């Protein structure tokens, strides 16, 4: 007999979306918001360079992130998965549409959906 899964124990996946959009900034705000429960397994999905680039522009330091390969490897706190590394465009600029950024967003969404269906 299969045991029931406690939904409170499951990781929560959050995709960064387009690296040139507001997704990375929202992720950073989530990480810095003290009202967000630190007792959950939050898994951010995207390209780490996008998060680092946005933190640099905002002038903030990222909190420690647990870099993982699979959602089931997540721990309580902030986790990060790069499903497929998409190289940062040479002329990357926040707020501008770029093919590589769209590809990065799609990779993150596909990975997140597959994780939900597993």
Go through each PLM region and give its residues:
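Contiguous, glycine/small-aliphatic-enriched amphipathic segments in soluble metabolic enzymes
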Residues: 1-118
């Amino acid at each position: 007999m299969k045991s029931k899964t406690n939904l409170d124990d499951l990781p929560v996946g959050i995709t960064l979306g387009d690296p040139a959009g507001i997704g990375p900034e929202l992720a950073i705000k989530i990480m810095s918001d003290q009202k967000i429960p630190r007792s959950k397994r939050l898994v951010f999905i995207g390209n780490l360079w996008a998060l680092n680039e946005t933190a640099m522009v905002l002038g903030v330091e990222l909190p420690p992130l647990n870099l993982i390969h699979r959602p089931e490897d997540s721990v309580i706190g902030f986790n990060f998965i790069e499903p497929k590394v998409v190289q940062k465009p040479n002329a990357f600029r926040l707020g501008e549409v770029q093919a590589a950024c769209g590809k990065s967003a799609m990779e993150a969404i596909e990975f997140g959906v597959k994780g939900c269906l597993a």
